[in-house]
């Protein structure tokens, strides 16, 4: 549709290789392949990418550009300041809201994050990774382990699904009773507990859990620190905490990003 309006479309060389799209596929669709990200920025008004600009990319941006990407600025004030200084107009995927209040561009990423949080959590529960050495699912003569999911939005709901499929007992904590009731209608009551979230209930749940998933999200704002440093002291040595909210600053007081 962009090409149909006599616009030019540039794609960075090899940008689609990892997802199965060759340079030739873009060429056949009418795009022109450029060698570097700088070439893309230099020749374009509208920049479409996946993640927020790296620090070295800010120098390529100016007031002539409209940047369309996942920005997650609430968790990175320095990046926000740098973007403002460029004069660029930024449109954040994660804040694009449909008429019904849903977040259609954030939802797919959240579903993936929720699923992966259980995979990563189980990996770090292994003894070689200094974990408890437990499997989440119940096996013969061994009781199921507990997983607590704090925040039952899209990512949290996917984590719940994955936890139940693994055979774990899942504690679901959310500030909305309506949300908890909705989830109970979906998941029933077997191997799952629905808990209204507050400081005491969070502390109690995470003290029993082998794995804790933090998935609290407030649109366009820094995630509230619902799991404090003091609460972490009640967790079992070797238990694991995965903070999905880290791209919005994290919902755990001590969380910090360790990868990009």
Protein language model annotation of sequence segments:
Residues 1-21, 128-214:
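Glycine-rich phosphate/diphosphate-binding loop of Rossmann-like nucleotide-binding domains
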């Amino acid at each position: 549709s962009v090409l149909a309006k006599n616009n030019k479309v540039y794609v960075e060389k090899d940008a689609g290789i990892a997802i199965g799209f060759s340079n030739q596929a873009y060429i056949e669709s009418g795009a022109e392949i450029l060698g570097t990200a700088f070439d893309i920025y230099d020749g374009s008004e509208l920049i479409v990418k996946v993640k927020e600009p790296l620090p070295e990319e800010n120098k390529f941006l100016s007031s002539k550009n409209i940047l369309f990407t996942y920005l997650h600025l609430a968790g990175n004030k320095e990046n926000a300041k740098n973007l403002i200084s460029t004069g660029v107009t930024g449109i954040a995927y994660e804040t694009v809201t449909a008429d019904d209040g849903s977040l259609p561009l954030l939802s797919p990423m959240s579903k993936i994050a929720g699923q992966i949080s259980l995979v990563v959590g189980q990996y770090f529960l292994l003894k070689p990774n200094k974990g408890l050495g437990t499997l989440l699912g119940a096996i013969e003569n061994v009781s199921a382990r507990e997983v607590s999911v704090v925040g039952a939005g899209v990512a949290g709901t996917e984590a719940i699904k994955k936890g139940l499929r693994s055979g774990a007992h899942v504690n679901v904590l959310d500030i909305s009773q309506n949300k908890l009731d909705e989830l109970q209608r979906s998941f029933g009551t077997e191997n799952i507990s629905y808990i209204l979230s507050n400081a005491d209930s969070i502390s109690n749940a995470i003290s029993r859990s082998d794995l804790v998933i933090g998935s609290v999200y407030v649109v366009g704002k820094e995630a509230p620190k619902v799991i404090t440093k003091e609460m972490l002291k009640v967790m079992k040595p070797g238990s694991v905490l995965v903070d999905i909210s880290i791209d919005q600053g994290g919902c755990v007081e001590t969380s910090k990003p360790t990868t990009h």
